[in-house]
């Protein structure tokens, strides 16, 4: 009898998994203690995620769906059970993965964490309204109070009580006057003049008019209180809650209302409600940008990028160089009419001529129609044509073409605030809701802690609970190292690590208990300094009664955990076993690759020498994007460069949002606009830029390492040359799963079918026709060395290297995949199943297999994400090979093994957010370690043994 399984089954204090065979897991048994912090570690591709997400989480999700009604389950379809014998002790499971929260431009940190919802409630309940016309405080009264105020202010004075009906609108209003006359009213005030309502009265329908109904004329006296009361009630009814008082003696006007109103201008606001402060609601959103904060506008700089060129030579990009056609003839006529020609440089054309060319004109100009005729016509302009193409819903191609001439600019009406004028004129302690949304979380925490003192007793009673909720959520964001962010930061602009920590903070704030949380590398993007705060937050979540599983490679996280499960020993088919399970103390004495790195038996060595580079530089000047403070950076070329700094210090803004877009525009005509900068020098020393990120290598199960590296075309060509293929007349397309012919049509060559789960993520199930092989029966009958095309795609890279050893064109491409440590993945493994680290290494392998000039700049943003110590060692070998070829590798990184291995470092800081945005230190790792300004220096000294 197998006693290990019996022990696992009997132990009710743990999540007990046994017989797990998902992906590469080899029938493993694992016990994860309840109410403890457990780290699952191992090499990239060893099976960590297969255990944590594809087994434990998948089974938790399946059991949750089984609790639904049969109707709901039918709507969702059947969730397949993970390949596991049994899981006991499983509590409700919440998965927090390293994916960007939301690509929707309306999603912000404030909306995701619900802090903005509480702010909306706060402003709706205690915000003080101010008129955007006069700056006066808005007021509202009861009818009784209005009567008291009129008697007090106008006692003994002749007044006219009126009801505002029309405010500055066009129309003849004949029907309105007729209705008022029938109700017995005698006078109206039209555009400031009182006149009698005579039969047939009507106004100029094409002019704007303001109309008020005269309800009563009286000399205000206390004894007439009842009359005044009736008058006010009638005027309120006719004026939709607003009355207007005109004092004859001093020619003054005042407004009174039961709703919020400006007593000077008569401007009224709706009764405040939370949706009035939402940029996702028509009641709160800016009418110009519809709550987005930006608008798309035609950019003259994109239409005419080079003003020194002539129109004939192609200065107007949408038109290109001169062609003998109608539009060029029109533009030629406009130029000649003003005494210029198409060959005049654009910078020498007068503004009015250029304006006519771009925007058109209404003047009929004589055009030369050839030998026999002349004709006259108006010209619409280049901009109108581009706008027509942009608005063409029928043609995506036309829209894409027009889109290249547009730029996104801050909305001119709301200045990026997303809200309408009314919503932005409610204040608490002198700040509107947008002011709070733009504050860094650390500053907003201070404001919420002190603002209660600035409120009246009544406001304090209303706001106390709301402020408490806001403060607690801000506290949790601060605890996970996100104090440098602001609530209006777009969710799509967050890194995977930031998104995950936001979700973590939200979960800590929810105070759920008896839940199993599974997190995927929460330390991504976190500086070593902030790691302790993250670990403390996870322990807080554990201490209130939850079980935490973290898939992680961070040494500090492992040592601070309660329990470690090490999956390995290697990756792919050589992994999938539990090589260690126990406490961190026990692990230090164990014999695994992970343990060897933690206890110091293995290490990533410090390079014996630092390279000097090729003597050339790429100099970026005057960077001011986001929090960058007019930064100048001089990148030495031919080196492994590293950008370091605490979270939010400006690393990504400098590299991903400034340098990379500039180079992409230069080399590839990219449409992405760089952040503000002055100039970039040294471009002549770089001939290509390659951004190697961790995004998937494709968007569908059809993309894989073989298609991405281009080796699949060579493999298909081998199959086409086989005698059986020639007899059957098969062409390369027969062996493609992207086109009809040879592929399985039931799954369209995917090998899987996607089952729509409505409000849950879609589930992929193997195709029942081809059993996941992707091809039809006839195609699979063609074999090379006894293997079908599907068998070849099912080979690991290591197997393929042996199989194709006599085919240099194929071997060269797949050998590189083996060299970057991906020998365990399958040639045809769908890109959707590759981790971020694996995708990145496939991209690096593709670049390594190409011939390069040695002047390429490679940009990598946190390439160590998802990588084990051993994987990082392999990655550094690949990066160093690229540098040895003469290229420059620029890495944004927090991992100390990579930082200590760099030739040259730029450390950003000193802090995050507004306190960052400067280069505080630069030089070799040894020079950075000696810096007193750098926060990274202390951690680097430890790594360098100083």
Please place each PLM-identified region on the residue numbering:
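Conserved phosphate-binding elements of NTP-dependent enzyme cores
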Residues: 1-946
């Amino acid at each position: 009898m197998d006693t290990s399984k019996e022990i696992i089954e009997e132990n009710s204090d743990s999540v007990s998994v046994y017989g797990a065979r998902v992906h590469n897991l080899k029938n493993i048994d694992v016990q994860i203690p309840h109410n403890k912090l457990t780290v699952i570690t191992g090499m990239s591709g060893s099976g960590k995620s297969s255990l944590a997400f594809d087994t434990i989480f998948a089974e938790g999700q399946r059991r949750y769906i089984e609790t639904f009604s049969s109707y709901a389950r039918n709507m969702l379809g059947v969730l397949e059970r993970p390949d596991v014998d049994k899981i006991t002790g499983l509590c409700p499971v919440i998965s927090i993965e390293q994916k960007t929260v939301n690509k929707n431009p309306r999603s912000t940190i404030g909306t995701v964490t619900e802090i903005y919802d509480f702010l909306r409630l706060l402003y709706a309940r205690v915000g003080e309204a101010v008129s955007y016309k006069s700056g006066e405080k808005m007021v509202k009264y009861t009818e009784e109070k209005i009567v008291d105020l009129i008697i007090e202010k106008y006692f003994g004075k002749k007044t006219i009580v009126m009801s505002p009906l029309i405010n500055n609108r066009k129309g003849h209003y004949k029907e309105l006057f007729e209705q008022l006359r029938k109700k017995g009213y005698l006078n109206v005030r039209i555009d400031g003049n009182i006149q009698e309502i005579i039969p047939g009265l009507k106004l100029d329908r094409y002019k704007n008019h303001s109309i008020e109904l005269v309800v009563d004329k009286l000399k205000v006296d206390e004894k007439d209180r009842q009359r005044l009361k009736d008058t006010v009630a009638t005027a309120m009814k006719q004026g939709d809650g607003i009355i207007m008082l005109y004092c004859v003696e001093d020619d003054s006007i005042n407004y009174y209302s039961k709703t919020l109103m400006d007593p000077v201008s008569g401007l009224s606001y709706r009764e405040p409600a939370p949706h009035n402060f939402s940029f996702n609601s028509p009641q709160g959103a800016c009418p110009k940008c519809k709550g987005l904060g930006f608008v798309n506008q035609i950019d003259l700089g994109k239409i005419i990028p080079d003003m020194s060129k002539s129109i004939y030579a192609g200065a107007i990009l949408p038109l290109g160089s001169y062609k003998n056609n109608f539009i060029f003839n029109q533009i030629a006529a406009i130029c000649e009419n003003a005494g210029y020609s198409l060959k005049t440089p654009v910078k020498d054309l007068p503004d009015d001529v250029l304006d006519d060319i771009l925007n058109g004109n209404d003047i009929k100009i004589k055009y030369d129609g050839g030998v026999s005729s002349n004709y006259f016509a108006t010209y619409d302009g280049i901009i109108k044509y581009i706008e027509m193409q942009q608005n063409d819903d029928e043609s995506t191609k036309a829209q894409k073409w027009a889109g290249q001439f547009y730029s996104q600019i801050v909305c001119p009406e709301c200045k990026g605030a997303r809200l309408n004028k009314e919503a932005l004129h409610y204040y608490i302690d002198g700040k509107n809701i947008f002011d709070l949304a733009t504050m860094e979380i650390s500053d907003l925490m201070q404001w919420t802690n002190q603002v209660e003192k600035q409120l009246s007793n009544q406001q304090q009673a209303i706001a106390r609970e709301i402020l408490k909720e806001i403060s607690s959520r801000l506290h949790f964001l601060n605890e996970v190292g996100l104090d440098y962010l602001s609530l209006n930061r777009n969710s799509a602009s967050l890194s995977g690590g930031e998104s995950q920590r936001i979700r973590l903070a939200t979960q800590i704030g929810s105070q759920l208990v008896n839940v199993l949380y599974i997190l995927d590398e929460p330390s991504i993007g976190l500086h070593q300094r902030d790691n302790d705060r993250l670990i403390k937050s996870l322990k807080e979540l554990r201490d209130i009664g939850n079980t935490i599983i973290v898939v992680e490679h961070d040494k500090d996280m492992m040592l601070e955990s309660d329990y470690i499960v090490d999956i390995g020993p290697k990756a792919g088919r050589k992994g999938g076993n539990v090589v260690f399970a126990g406490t961190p103390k026990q692990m230090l004495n164990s014999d695994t690759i992970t343990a060897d790195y933690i206890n110091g038996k293995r290490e990533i060595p410090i390079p014996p020498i630092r390279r000097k580079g090729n003597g050339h530089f790429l100099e970026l000047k005057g960077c001011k994007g986001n929090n960058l403070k007019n930064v100048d950076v001089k990148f030495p070329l031919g080196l492994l460069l590293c950008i370091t700094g605490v979270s939010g210090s400006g690393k990504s803004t400098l590299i991903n949002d400034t340098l990379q877009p500039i180079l992409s525009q230069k080399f590839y005509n990219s449409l992405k606009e760089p952040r503000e900068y002055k100039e970039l020098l040294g471009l002549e020393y770089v001939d290509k830029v390659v951004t190697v990120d961790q995004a998937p290598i494709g968007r569908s199960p059809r993309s894989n390492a073989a298609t991405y590296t281009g080796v699949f075309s060579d493999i298909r060509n081998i199959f086409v040359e086989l005698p059986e293929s020639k007899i059957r007349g098969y062409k390369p397309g027969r062996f493609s799963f992207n086109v009809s012919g040879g592929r399985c049509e039931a799954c369209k060559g995917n090998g899987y079918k996607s089952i729509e789960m409505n409000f849950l993520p879609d589930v992929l199930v193997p195709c029942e026709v081809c059993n996941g092989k992707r091809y039809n029966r006839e195609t699979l009958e063609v074999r090379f060395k006894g293997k079908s095309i599907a068998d070849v795609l099912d080979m690991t890279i290591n197997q393929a290297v042996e199989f194709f050893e006599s085919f240099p064109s194929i071997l060269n491409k797949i050998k590189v995949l083996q060299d970057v440590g991906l020998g365990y993945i399958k040639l045809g493994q769908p890109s959707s199943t590759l981790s971020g680290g694996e995708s990145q290494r496939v991209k690096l392998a593709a670049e390594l297999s190409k011939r390069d000039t040695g002047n390429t700049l490679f940009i990598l943003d946190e390439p160590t994400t998802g990588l084990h110590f051993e994987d990082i060692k392999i990655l550094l070998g690949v990066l160093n090979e690229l540098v040895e070829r003469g290229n420059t590798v620029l890495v944004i990184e927090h991992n100390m093994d990579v930082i200590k291995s760099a030739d040259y470092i730029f450390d950003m800081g000193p802090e995050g957010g507004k306190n960052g945005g400067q280069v505080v230190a630069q030089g070799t790792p040894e020079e950075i370690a000696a810096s007193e300004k750098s926060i990274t220096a202390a951690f680097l000294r430890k790594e360098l043994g100083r």
